[in-house]
Amino acid sequence: MGFFRLQNIKLINNVFKADCIKKMKLIETESIDMILCDLPYGHTQNKWDSIIPLDILWKEYERIIKPNGAIVLTSSGMFTAELMLSNPKLFKYKIIWEKSKATNFLNAKKQPLRKYEEICVFYKKQPTYNPQMSMGVPYNKGTRKNQLTGSYGDFLPVEVKSEGARYPNDIIYFKTAESEGKVYHPTQKPIELGRYLVKTYTNLGDTVLDNTCGSGSFLISALLEGRNFIGIEKDEDSNRFKADSVSYVEISKKRIKEAYLTLDSESKERITLYKSKLFKER
């Protein structure tokens, strides 16, 4: 079970309409276990897709993340390069998210369709890492001989076998958001992608921040995996697919409440320990 400092109590398990830089200043130093965020990429002319100044963002990120916390940010194209170079000291590696549906059909006769996005992982010290194992065919290749001239030093004889469990690699496949139901946001990420990342980089009861939470998918991911969350969304100039004006904060809250109702009683009790108004059942 995570431990909350007094300053964060009013923020935990809620979604706030605010400028994320200003709101993050209210979060206590070194109190967040994971930042999981789908930042604006700056790929469109929409006001909500404007890139947040990364130097200012990193100042707050580095202040609020725990020394062994993970900062996990989705990205694509040139924004990936900008993101990596914005903090080379903390950047560690990328994960490729292979999507079920491609994009870029307007340029299909000029360029390949785009079927992946990237996930950039940053941290100060080695964070929690729970590799999400998959199952393959068991094998036993016998005993490996001495290897005394390898690039990584000498190896003694060892039996090479597996019961079938396979460690994850840096390419992961998840269906896009429409496979999970209604899509509320133009860049909505799938809840299952978020659950995979939350399980990988946090433990039960930890706190996850999404400072540009959109329609709340990553917050739901945290909730379903027994983690606490803080969501921030500016909610500025929000028109769903250039149609009716919407409030993504209200959409997030509605989706989170619906997800909360699917939890078992033990999971609900874990959340309501912190008396979040968001989870009051009627």
Which role fits each region the language model picked out?
Residues G2-I232, E236-S245, V249:
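Core catalytic lobe of class I
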